[in-house]
Amino acid sequence: MFKKSSWYALMTILVVAATALSACGPAATSAPTQPAATQPAESKLAVGIVLPTKDEPRWIQDETRFKDALTAAGYDVQILFSQGDSAKEKANVEALISQGIQVLIICPQDGTAAAAAAEEARAAGVKVISYDRLIRDTDAVDYYVTFDSVAVGEAWGQYLIDNATGTGHNLYLYAGAASDNNAFLFFEGAWNKLQPKIADGTFVIKNSSEAVALQSKATLTREEMAKIIGQVTTNWDFTVAKNLAEANLTAAPAADKGTVFIVAPNDGTARSIADAFAADKDVTKYYVTGQDAEKASVQYIIDGKQSMTVLKDVRTLVADAITAAVAYLKGSTPAQTNTYNNGKIDVPAKPSAIVTVTKDNVKAAIIDSGYYSASDFTGLP
């Protein structure tokens, strides 16, 4: 049993964590604060968290924010990393179950492979919150905390369209891991925007025969997207991304270079791909997308090496995940504004908004919102 003061301390942390989700444009606005609970929880927050890897800055940020929020409120939390290994991920879940957790927050390395771990948690009476990436092909998922992943891809497509005049622009497509459901959602969003402009000749696909074969289709099935992603996957790996980009450039004639437009699936791969294109003497200019607003990519944007990123304010996502966990611990149901089909069920969800960041609004979106400090960067506009 814990005191009301502990509950109020927790909710205070949630409010702080959810502050200032920036608006897209020259000014930043604040994200809604989490609703105050009417009753204190009856037990300590028994939550285990499993994140995919320590090798990407994004997940280290999430670890820090989860740990800071829960520790400051007086709760113990254990955060384990799967390091890109689904077997280790399952072992992590089993270890947390053995410690008596009541709620599992898990960002799966492989959405389909994680189904077995989710089912084991469900069998133990644990509520399962799929965090940022969706666990697929199982009914053992209670809730999905995510950003609007389709909107992320649409932001990429719209940015490239806004910077393309005329026709015949060289387009290079890259994607995340084929094992990650989000990679499909991001690609779906990008295709939603780009396909009409591919069909009318604004863009010409240069690095995927599968995409060329499907370019007349406004809506792709998952199987069709899988064919394209299979050709252009980076597997979320910076080295894979760089090697693939270099291979594409080696195979491309000079006419397929010049000014190029590039769909890159996240900031780490965007930097690697941008470096490869920048090093090619036949590439005169490039526009490249990204997401996660990693510090290194924010600096790349300031320096003109990366064109844009999509800010997904993990403070809001962490706060939403904790709020959902608290709701389950109190015997209630988290707020729902949407559902995502995971191949087996429609999973309740509350997707958070995203913000497009370019050099024009980087200060408002990143610095003025409090997401990062100005001292983290040089040459801010």
Predicted regions, residues:
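C-terminal motif of bacterial Sec signal peptides marking the signal peptidase cleavage site
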Residues: 18-23
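Extracellular adhesion/carbohydrate-binding repeat motifs centered on closely spaced tryptophans
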Residues: 15
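Bacterial N-terminal signal peptides that target proteins for export
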Residues: 1-11
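A residue-level marker of the well-folded mature domains of exported/periplasmic proteins
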Residues: 3-4, 25-381
